[in-house]
């Protein structure tokens, strides 16, 4: 694994590059208030099993960043995602690109489908926010009522981000956890519907990958994602 920086407008973000083959690259987007270290176990497994290279970024305000995450907007994090994707295309011009996002990172990955073309989309417990939240400072986002609107089918059916999902031309996989405290089944069901996605169900799991699930269940979870990525 190599540590590197991705240049953005006027600053840079940290990233880890897992080197596999040159023909496939996976962009990995972590969740809110998380970091690239949290993605190491799953990413290492996918690199070993599929032969893909992988780039794991760390948003501004996360990890060792000097910025305050609460003073950053999701829109700024999305520009960082764009910069990372474009770095991949520059460094691996002939590679098949896949994107895997977890929770907030899943929300970012879905935003990316509007602006960049890629082959595979993996959404692990993907979050969703109100349209105005995308341009709000994180400190102004009402996180106390997130689950309420994520369970609201009218909200989900009218959300512009989901309305344009059908234009995505690649494959999609949605991973959902039975006991998720933050992303309810209504949200993951809607993502499955709009992307015509395959799905993987983690019975008894809460939101975080770091659960009390038995080791064999964790291995099955990782293998399911790996096997899906290896499909053509």
Where are these regions (language model features)?
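Conserved alpha/beta-hydrolase
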Residues: 47-66
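Catalytic histidine-centered segment of alpha/beta-hydrolase-like enzymes
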Residues: 205-218
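Alpha/beta-hydrolase active-site loop
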Residues: 38, 72-91
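Conserved alpha/beta-hydrolase "acid-adjacent" motif
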Residues: 181-187
């Amino acid at each position: 694994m190599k540590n590197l920086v991705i240049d953005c407008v006027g600053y840079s973000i940290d990233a880890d590059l897992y080197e596999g083959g040159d023909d496939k690259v996976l962009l990995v987007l972590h969740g809110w208030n998380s970091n690239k270290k949290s993605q190491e176990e799953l990413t290492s497994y996918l690199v070993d099993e599929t032969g893909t290279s992988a780039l794991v970024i760390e948003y501004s305000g996360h990890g060792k960043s000097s910025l305050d995450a609460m003073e950053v907007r999701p829109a700024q994090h999305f520009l960082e995602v764009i910069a990372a994707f474009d770095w991949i295309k520059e460094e691996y011009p002939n590679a098949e690109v896949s994107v895997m996002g977890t929770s907030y990172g899943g929300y970012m990955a879905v935003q990316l489908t509007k602006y960049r073309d890629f082959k595979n989309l993996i959404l692990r417990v993907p979050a969703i926010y109100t349209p105005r939240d995308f341009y709000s400072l994180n400190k102004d986002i009402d996180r106390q009522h997130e689950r309420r609107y994520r369970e609201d089918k009218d909200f989900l059916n009218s959300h512009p981000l989901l309305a344009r999902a059908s234009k995505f031309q690649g494959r999609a996989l949605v991973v959902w956890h039975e006991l998720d405290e933050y992303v309810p089944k209504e949200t993951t069901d809607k993502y499955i519907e709009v992307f015509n996605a395959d799905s993987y169900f983690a019975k008894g799991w809460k939101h975080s990958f770091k659960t009390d699930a038995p080791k064999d269940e964790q291995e099955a979870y990782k293998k399911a994602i790996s096997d899906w990525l290896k499909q053509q």
